[in-house]
Amino acid sequence: MNIFTKKPNPREVLRESKREMTQATRGIEKEIGSLQSEEKKLVLEIKRTAKSGNEGATKILARQLIRLRQQIANLQGSRAQMRGIATHTQAMHAHTSVAAGMQGATKAMAAMSKNMDPAKQAKVMREFQKQSAQMDMTTEMMSDSIDDALDNDEAEDETEDLTNQVLDEIGIDIASQLSSAPKGKIGGKKAEDVGSSGIDELEKRLAALR
């Protein structure tokens, strides 16, 4: 072991690790895209074979499609794992940075404590806590207001999306029903005739009772 070898910097190690995982993820995504292209071609081939009436060949191609889709699913799982590892590594680096920052802050506070009067320091800390509490309250109120506004917008957007989706799904049925349904004027005339005949019949019965 070379005692003069420079100890790797954690940030450099993280950067190299991220680069390797990014390359691996891109390779997986490229392979997924290639298999998905093959999947589309295979689906078209299955349709053509089915139309020709070749049942045996259609079943063989269908089995190939199942295996192909399983390969795609496996690669997608590997891609998700790579991304999870990258996220975990980044989080570990963040925790390390926080720990280093806290260590530096502790040293700074210790140095300041030596040069500050305890009573004055206590007063500064109380004022700091007071201002921090006010800032937290203001931030929380602003956050609640923003969340309420976003929730309303999201609810409206989701409702609009669901409405459009339902209309798209039943649009053909509505069109066919409208094309076969009687026109509004004709329907209205029939309803009016039925209503008038009912009223006339009721008047006749009342006249007979008199």
From Swiss-Prot:
Coiled coil: 28-84
UniProt-recorded name of the protein: Vacuolar protein sorting-associated protein 2 homolog 3
Listed GO biological process terms: protein transport; vacuolar transport
GO cellular component: ESCRT III complex
Assembly mode: Component of the endosomal sorting required for transport complex III (ESCRT-III), composed at least of VPS2, VPS20, VPS24 and VPS32.
Gene3D superfamilies assigned: 6.10.140.1230
Cellular location(s): Endosome
InterPro entries reported for this sequence: Snf7_fam
Keyword flag 4Fe-4S: no
Cysteines joined through disulfide linkages: none
Main location: other
Family, per entry: Belongs to the SNF7 family.
Function of the protein: Component of the ESCRT-III complex, which is required for multivesicular bodies (MVBs) formation and sorting of endosomal cargo proteins into MVBs. The ESCRT-III complex is probably involved in the concentration of MVB cargo.
Ranges where the record places region Disordered: 1-23, 178-200
Keywords per UniProt: Coiled coil, Endosome, Protein transport, Transport
Compositional bias segments (type: Basic and acidic residues): 9-23
Species this chain originates from: Arabidopsis thaliana
Domain of life: Eukaryota
